[in-house]
């Protein structure tokens, strides 16, 4: 029986946040030497990060790694700040999606955006640097939210340019962050996740506005 205050429709969301926090918490404690062993983070990245080279001629650490990494990378983060920003965003966007869709639809968008973000990163990212973080999936959630808003505005003959303005703002923000981070921002995953989430929003069921 769920305790008061826990929404049963948010169980997958709770689980995602918990898993990401536990993993990064353990890695951060390992970095400080409290648990684990030297270079524990590097080893976890070796097995769980998204490595574009594994889609070419690199030898995987285990047979399923070239496929599993399309999902596992989204559970890893580069540090506590990276984790905090992504989990706060996941909590906010996740609830917004679950306000309009079922838990199953949320899973479709989130996992689909993880796959789509990784695929676009593999195609467009220069070099063979690895990728970690849930931001591809987060942009997928945002893409779904904006797609539903566009659909609602279209049905109500509202201002559809509002959605276009938000998309352009997001593109500009990614450009600024990419420059500020000296090209280390995985904008390709953001783009792929967003497009996947947008498309998924047109394919899955959602609650009408009046029933939210």
Locations of regions flagged by a protein language model:
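A detector for small-residue-rich transmembrane helices and their helix-helix packing motifs
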Residues: 1-212
């Amino acid at each position: 029986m769920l305790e008061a205050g826990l929404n049963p429709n948010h169980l997958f969301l709770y689980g995602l946040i918990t898993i990401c926090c536990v993993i990064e918490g353990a890695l951060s404690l390992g970095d400080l030497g409290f648990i684990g062993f030297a270079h524990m983070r590097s080893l976890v990245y070796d097995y769980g990060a998204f490595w574009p080279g594994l889609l070419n001629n690199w030898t995987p650490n285990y047979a399923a790694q070239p496929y599993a990494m399309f999902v596992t990378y989204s559970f890893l983060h580069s540090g506590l700040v990276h984790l905090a920003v992504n989990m706060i965003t996941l909590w906010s966007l996740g609830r917004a999606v679950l306000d309009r869709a079922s838990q199953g639809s949320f899973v479709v968008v989130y996992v689909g955006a993880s796959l789509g973000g990784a695929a676009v990163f593999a195609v467009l990212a220069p070099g063979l640097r690895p990728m970690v973080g849930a931001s591809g999936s987060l942009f997928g959630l945002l893409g779904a939210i904006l797609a539903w808003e566009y659909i609602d505005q279209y049905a109500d003959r509202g201002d559809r340019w509002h959605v276009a303005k938000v998309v352009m703002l997001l593109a500009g923000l990614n450009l600024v962050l990419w420059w500020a981070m000296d090209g280390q921002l995985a904008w390709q995953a953001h783009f792929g996740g967003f497009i996947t989430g947008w498309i998924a929003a047109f394919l899955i069921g959602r609650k009408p506005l009046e029933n939210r």
